């Protein structure tokens, strides 16, 4: 049976030497039809599926398929292209040595997307919140785990579905060397987060108009599953450590388990509950 110590040791096993340290970037974006300002569809003549086949011709490899045997990810040289709800496209970059390399990687990715966009009269938009679409106008991609999230989100906040369909971001990932280094980086990142949000806020538009909120993205995240989202007080203190993070994560409701290749709803269980006993698929339903 899985123990709390196993989870703590997982983080310890991820320590990296300073010489081998790396960074990674996750880059999300919206894609619109320029003519009608509608978001790109999942399938069709000009769609995510068609875009994926275009990228395969550029050297990307097929990745994961959904339960309908539709392609939902690509990979190449340690990087991947995946889908967020609402047909948002995400580059999950490979581990690189510095920001110059991740800049080159991101621009190469955007260059490939722009080539497809120009051929098909599409617009690529890098904003924190969709400035045009209403929530009900955005297509949910047929991805099994997103179905579970879609059903659960309204129970734990009023804006979770907006987060899923109408927000984008850029995320930075950093290696850590030991417990002290992890604490220093994690606490500093959380303390700096409000400043970073203010500096880079770029989403003052919502459903075609300016609504006086400088960052609709942050506004949306403030009421999205508050048990797991937001800046927690314990994340600001230098007494923070791996065990405290594990304690926090164990009490959060779990979204799903993958059992026999299928995503199964576990939203009524915390991670701690699932550690105590792994329920069978039929008992979860």
Residue locations for each model-derived region?
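Terminal catalytic/cofactor-binding subdomain
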Residues: 1-157, 166, 285
């Amino acid at each position: 049976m899985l123990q709390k110590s196993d989870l703590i040791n997982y983080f310890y096993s991820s320590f990296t030497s300073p010489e081998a340290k790396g960074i990674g970037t996750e880059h999300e974006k919206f894609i619109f039809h320029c003519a009608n300002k509608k978001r790109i569809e999942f399938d069709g003549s000009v769609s995510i599926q068609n875009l994926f086949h275009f990228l395969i011709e550029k050297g990307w490899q097929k990745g994961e398929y959904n339960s309908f045997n539709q392609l939902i990810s690509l990979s190449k040289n340690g990087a991947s292209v995946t889908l967020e709800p609402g047909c948002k496209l995400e580059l999950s970059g490979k581990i690189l040595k510095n920001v110059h390399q991740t800049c080159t990687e991101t621009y190469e990715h955007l260059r490939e997307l722009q080539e497809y966009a120009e051929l098909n009269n599409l617009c690529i938009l890098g904003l924190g919140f969709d400035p045009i679409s209403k929530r009900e106008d955005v297509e949910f991609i047929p991805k099994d785990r997103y179905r579970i999230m879609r059903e659960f989100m309204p129970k734990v906040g009023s804006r979770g579905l907006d987060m899923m369909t109408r927000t984008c971001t850029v995320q930075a990932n950093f290696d850590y060397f030991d417990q002290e280094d992890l604490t220093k980086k994690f606490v500093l990142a959380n303390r700096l987060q409000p400043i970073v949000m203010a500096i880079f806020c770029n989403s003052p538009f919502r459903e075609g108009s300016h609504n006086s909120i400088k960052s609709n993205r942050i506004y949306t995240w403030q009421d999205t599953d508050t048990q797991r989202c937001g800046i927690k007080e314990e994340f600001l203190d230098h007494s923070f450590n791996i065990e405290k993070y594990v304690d926090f994560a164990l009490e959060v409701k779990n979204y799903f388990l993958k059992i026999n290749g299928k995503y199964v709803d576990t939203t009524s269980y915390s991670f701690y509950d699932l550690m105590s006993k792994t329920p069978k698929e039929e008992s979860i339903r």
